[in-house]
Regions:
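Core solenoid repeat modules with strong leucine/isoleucine-rich periodicity
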Residues: 1-22, 51-57, 62-70, 113, ...
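TPR repeat positional signature
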Residues: 49-50, 70, 77, 101, ...
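Flexible helix-coil transition and linker loops at the boundaries of alpha-helical arrays
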Residues: 52-66, 103-117, 168-196, 241-244
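Residues that mark the junctions of alpha-helical repeat units in TPR/alpha-solenoid scaffolds
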Residues: 46, 59, 64-73, 97, ...
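Short coil/turn linking the two alpha-helices of tandem helical-hairpin repeats
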Residues: 2, 79-88, 125, 130-140, ...
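Acidic, serine/threonine- and proline-enriched intrinsically disordered linkers and terminal tails
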Residues: 1-42, 134, 144-151, 171
């Protein structure tokens, strides 16, 4: 700059600064003026700031920040939904969470983004599973064509949810892949200890979902066989995780008990359907 020249004006506050100011409201009064104790206004202000920040952090070059912001927006919807009594509004809030996370998850295909894709995938799958469970509980309200249409839609949503869980498991296993010279170990043994619980929970929920059949097909046991295989894998991985790590004795105890019950029950049900051509009841 030449001597005597007028210095350039400082740049306007960045969107990142607006986002950070949520932790220190006095720095950004425009976000908090008039909110007072109204949580709905605070929620809307948070969403506005997050969306401005996300528009600034384009995906290229700011991947981690973009993921963090998407998860924060999802958290906003999660918190505001905790005491939502209306079914339709609650389901819409859950769909909003999926909408702000799943496109980003789908965009992160590069191997370097395995951990971020897994993080997003686990949250998306959990929300989708909650949507499936809520819809399933309301099926008894319908009959005839309306029931059949909802059953078909729910079957497709269930499959989508399981696919997202499976992708999460795949990303975790890939992120823990064996290096040259390593002693061969299973994916559960190679995972970081902080990831084990999420990995096991994903396996268990996917096993339960695969066992649900909203559109019955006489003689079809494929979903039951897949569910049985997953329950057995849960038991094997729990044993491997406990052996490889200093986990408490009651780790995954409730889920493990349910897995063992299903491993005992399912073969009889599968055999019955194969021999009679009947329909396997939901389990």
């Amino acid at each position: 700059m030449e001597d005597g020249a007028t210095p350039p004006k400082p740049p306007a506050a960045t969107l990142a600064a607006d986002f950070r100011s949520l932790g220190a409201p006095e720095r950004s009064p425009d976000l908090v003026d008039g909110i007072g104790g109204d949580l709905r206004l605070a929620f809307r202000a948070a969403l506005r700031a997050l969306r401005r920040a996300r528009s600034y952090y384009v995906l290229d070059g700011f991947v981690t920040e973009h993921v963090d912001l998407a998860r924060l927006e999802s958290t906003c919807w999660k918190l505001v939904s905790l005491k939502e009594p209306d079914y339709a509004r609650l389901q819409q809030m859950r769909r909003r969470r999926v909408a702000c996370l799943d496109p980003l998850r789908d965009a992160l295909q590069a191997d370097a983004y395995r951990d971020l894709r897994a993080t997003l995938g686990y949250e998306v799958a959990q929300v989708l599973a909650a949507i499936v469970e809520a819809k399933a509980e309301r099926l008894r309200r319908y009959s005839g064509q309306a029931l059949r249409e909802r059953q078909q839609a729910l079957e497709a949503l269930k499959d989508r949810t399981c696919d997202v869980f499976d992708d999460f498991l795949k990303q975790c296993a890939g992120d823990a892949r064996t290096q040259p010279g390593d002693t061969p170990r299973s994916a559960i043994e190679r995972l970081a200890e902080s990831d084990v619980e999420a990995y096991m929970n994903a396996q268990f929920v996917a096993a339960r979902l695969r066992g649900k059949r909203f559109v019955a097909i006489p003689g079809d046991v494929r979903h039951a066989e897949d569910s049985l295989r997953r329950y057995k894998q849960c038991v094997a991985d729990t044993a491997a995780a406990k052996k490889a790590r200093n986990l408490p004795e009651d780790f995954f105890a409730r889920e493990l008990d349910l897995c063992e019950q299903m491993i005992h029950l399912l073969p009889t049900k599968i055999h019955h359907v194969r021999t009679t051509g009947g329909v396997l009841e939901d389990f």
